Amino acid sequence: MLTSPPKFDDVQIVLADPRAHVRSALKVALTHAGLYNISQANSTAAVRDNLEQSVGPDILICDMGLDDGEICKMVSDLRHHNIGRNPFLCVIGMTWQPEAHQVTQMLDCGIDHLILAPVSPQKVMARITSLIHNRPEFVVTADYVGPDRRMRTRGDLEPGLVEAPNSLRSKAIESWNHRQFE
């Protein structure tokens, strides 16, 4: 069965990095891949403003060191629906500092993917494609809301797992219905 390539016409991206040259290079690469609706942010305050838009973005691609790591708290707040309109927003984090404790903190805030910098456009597009076609179910607890990263050793019954609404997938390969995400 042939599948159509993703359509990115309506996909909204927020690209957050404190370095203008990194944002610019990623924006050019994403534009070449067909992603045109890209907002840029250089601080967590600017990201927060983008998240509060009427429908909000479909993907947040962010440097996890933004504002001295404050972005981790913001992503956690997003996942717990304390900010933004869509707690299930696709989030791709980037880091230049892959120390174990920092990576653990980044994953624990609920990001979907973490890419080690320097970042190639191919890595970013591979993660976007993965979020469209293979996004894992989400664990929803009082302490953590985010992708299920556990190994399947406890059987089929997994309390707290939900299929997260995915506006990226809906816009790229399905029929987009904004009411599903209000």
Regions found by a protein language model. Name each.
Residues 73, 97-113:
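Alpha4 helix (beta4-alpha4-beta5 surface) of REC/receiver domains from two-component response regulators
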Residues 133-182:
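CheY-like receiver
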